[in-house]
Amino acid sequence: MSQFDSAAFIAGFPLKAHNTFGFDVRAQFACRIEREEQLMAAVRDPRAAGLPRLVLGGGSNVVLTGDFGGLVLLIALRGRRVAREDNDAWYVEAAGGEPWHEFVGWTLAQGLPGLENLALIPGTVGAAPIQNIGAYGLEMVERFASLRAVELATGDVVEMDAHACRFGYRDSFFKREGRDRFVITSVTFRLPKVWQPRAGYADLARELAAKGHADTPPTAQAIFDAVVAVRRAKLPDPLELGNAGSFFKNPVVEAAQFEALKTTEPEIVSYLQPDGRVKLAAGWLIDRCGWKGRAMGAAAVHERQALVLVNRGGASGTEVLALAKAIQRDVLERFGVELEAEPVCL
């Protein structure tokens, strides 16, 4: 007998409130998952056999181009705790359905700094490793210890360390070989007891200076507050204007290509990488192509941040993808650089 209550299968479930673009689409079936055991039972349930599956947490990294003909698993796993500590770090575990920003704020309230640069990133804890989220000089992988996940094909629980997750820039095993195969149910982070502020990014440094930290080292809370202020000034609230945050990755090019670009574009915004390659600011490339503030139907490029595509009201996922492809085409033609979309497009 399945542990999965048949009432949990909801037919024709509306997904508008479950994706931050606000696309008005539906799922053939949906199920709200509040316990790991429930997830294990759900994926083994005969009624789910043969159905395509889509895992949604905050829905902040997905473009839904139409109704989903399968089972949507709505991850609502909650809980957070200090699991253990050693001489060097605290190990903090959070359930996959915990809202990311709330979790970061909670760690600071417990006196556990280390994640403050990642404040206000949309989505859930379980989505953070998939994307290897990063911002303002910090990537999640630098604070990652391990995770638990349920394999959708079997319902078995697996534990994975950083090596198994194969993290890269906005990338992981879960976006490649592991795509659509696992649901991350909890993540454990390693927060060092010896904390050092990271405040080198220009926007962040300016905000901190404006708040009185020009000559004194900022606290973790000050960095958190500054990141929130900077992000709110640049990025629209998905509750007010549908979006998925940064739509494109910052491309990384070889040094020779960068030097060639610099001869024709001396103001190009760039960041030298440890391996000698150069990361380019995708927003600058898009802006230079004249896309900031432009629209195609109800899909548009945000007027303050060219990296953000928005739903001005009634746009479909197909319209947003058409806009994204037009931007990619223009950037490639002008700079010879291919932009890669961050969200998963379905």
Swiss-Prot record:
<dbReference type="GO" id="GO:0008360">
    <property type="term" value="P:regulation of cell shape"/>
</dbReference>
<keyword id="KW-0285">Flavoprotein</keyword>
<dbReference type="InterPro" id="IPR036635">
    <property type="entry name" value="MurB_C_sf"/>
</dbReference>
<keyword id="KW-0573">Peptidoglycan synthesis</keyword>
<dbReference type="InterPro" id="IPR003170">
    <property type="entry name" value="MurB"/>
</dbReference>
<protein>
    <recommendedName>
        <fullName>UDP-N-acetylenolpyruvoylglucosamine reductase</fullName>
        <ecNumber>1.3.1.98</ecNumber>
    </recommendedName>
</protein>
<dbReference type="InterPro" id="IPR006094">
    <property type="entry name" value="Oxid_FAD_bind_N"/>
</dbReference>
<feature type="active site">
    <location>
        <position position="170"/>
    </location>
</feature>
<dbReference type="InterPro" id="IPR011601">
    <property type="entry name" value="MurB_C"/>
</dbReference>
<comment type="similarity">
    <text>Belongs to the MurB family.</text>
</comment>
<dbReference type="Pfam" id="PF01565">
    <property type="entry name" value="FAD_binding_4"/>
</dbReference>
<keyword id="KW-0961">Cell wall biogenesis/degradation</keyword>
<dbReference type="Pfam" id="PF02873">
    <property type="entry name" value="MurB_C"/>
</dbReference>
<keyword id="KW-0521">NADP</keyword>
<comment type="function">
    <text>Cell wall formation.</text>
</comment>
<dbReference type="GO" id="GO:0071949">
    <property type="term" value="F:FAD binding"/>
</dbReference>
<dbReference type="GO" id="GO:0005829">
    <property type="term" value="C:cytosol"/>
</dbReference>
<dbReference type="GO" id="GO:0008762">
    <property type="term" value="F:UDP-N-acetylmuramate dehydrogenase activity"/>
</dbReference>
<feature type="domain" description="FAD-binding PCMH-type">
    <location>
        <begin position="23"/>
        <end position="194"/>
    </location>
</feature>
<feature type="active site" description="Proton donor">
    <location>
        <position position="246"/>
    </location>
</feature>
<dbReference type="InterPro" id="IPR016167">
    <property type="entry name" value="FAD-bd_PCMH_sub1"/>
</dbReference>
<dbReference type="GO" id="GO:0051301">
    <property type="term" value="P:cell division"/>
</dbReference>
<keyword id="KW-0560">Oxidoreductase</keyword>
<dbReference type="InterPro" id="IPR016169">
    <property type="entry name" value="FAD-bd_PCMH_sub2"/>
</dbReference>
<keyword id="KW-0274">FAD</keyword>
<comment type="pathway">
    <text>Cell wall biogenesis; peptidoglycan biosynthesis.</text>
</comment>
<feature type="active site">
    <location>
        <position position="342"/>
    </location>
</feature>
<dbReference type="InterPro" id="IPR036318">
    <property type="entry name" value="FAD-bd_PCMH-like_sf"/>
</dbReference>
<keyword id="KW-0963">Cytoplasm</keyword>
<dbReference type="GO" id="GO:0071555">
    <property type="term" value="P:cell wall organization"/>
</dbReference>
<keyword id="KW-0133">Cell shape</keyword>
<keyword id="KW-0131">Cell cycle</keyword>
<dbReference type="GO" id="GO:0009252">
    <property type="term" value="P:peptidoglycan biosynthetic process"/>
</dbReference>
<keyword id="KW-0132">Cell division</keyword>
<dbReference type="InterPro" id="IPR016166">
    <property type="entry name" value="FAD-bd_PCMH"/>
</dbReference>
